[in-house]
Amino acid sequence: MGLETEKADVQLFMDDDAYSHHSGVDFADPEKFPDTGPDRDPHGLNSHLKLGFEDVIAEPVTTHSFDKVWICSHALFEISKYVLYKFLTVFLAIPLAFAAGVLFAVLSCLHIWILMPFVKTCLMVLPSVQTIWRSVTDVVIAPLCASIGRSFSSVGLQLSHD
């Protein structure tokens, strides 16, 4: 721990052009996977999930672990993230997609067949309610407020400074 003074016997040379800066696993033979397929997130809904090892684990200059530990932990992080994601999607993707589809269908049905007719009915009845409310206000509330206002208008307040 701390600032290392020994040299690691492992060296890694890499051109900037050959180094992939994405957070996925780099396969040894890129010819085996020539096309990654269409973009499955064209609107960038999950762009916040594009995390790399450096985004999660960061060691300041004053506290570096051994180089071999850093390299092994980086490799283990990337491999476990890749393998565990694939494993979880095999078992959870289809049931969760089904549940999301059912939920979306239920919410759409409720919105189309219950909520919108209720809102439209309220908007149809609202002008009648508005007319009745205006009449109640003019007949009951306006005279009441006027009489209370006249009563309090005759109240006088005198301040004396002693």
Swiss-Prot record:
It is a peripheral membrane protein. InterPro entries: Caveolin, Caveolin_CS. Residues 87-107 dip into the membrane without crossing it. One of its GO terms (biological process) is caveola assembly. Phosphorylated on serine and tyrosine residues. CAV1 promotes phosphorylation on Ser-23 which then targets the complex to the plasma membrane, lipid rafts and caveolae. Phosphorylation on Tyr-19 is required for insulin-induced phosphorylation of MAPK1 and DNA binding of STAT3. Tyrosine phosphorylation is induced by both EGF and insulin. The keyword Ligase does not apply. The modification Phosphotyrosine is found at residue 19. The modification Phosphoserine is found at residues 20, 23. GO terms for cellular component: caveola; cytoplasmic vesicle; focal adhesion; Golgi membrane; nucleus; perinuclear region of cytoplasm; plasma membrane raft; sarcolemma. May act as a scaffolding protein within caveolar membranes. Interacts directly with G-protein alpha subunits and can functionally regulate their activity. Acts as an accessory protein in conjunction with CAV1 in targeting to lipid rafts and driving caveolae formation. Positive regulator of cellular mitogenesis of the MAPK signaling pathway. Required for the insulin-stimulated nuclear translocation and activation of MAPK1 and STAT3, and the subsequent regulation of cell cycle progression. Monomer or homodimer. Interacts with CAV1; the interaction forms a stable heterooligomeric complex that is required for targeting to lipid rafts and for caveolae formation. Tyrosine phosphorylated forms do not form heterooligomers with the Tyr-19-phosphorylated form existing as a monomer or dimer. Interacts (tyrosine phosphorylated form) with the SH2 domain-containing proteins, RASA1, NCK1 and SRC. Interacts (tyrosine phosphorylated form) with INSR. Belongs to the caveolin family. This is Caveolin-2. It comes from Oryctolagus cuniculus.
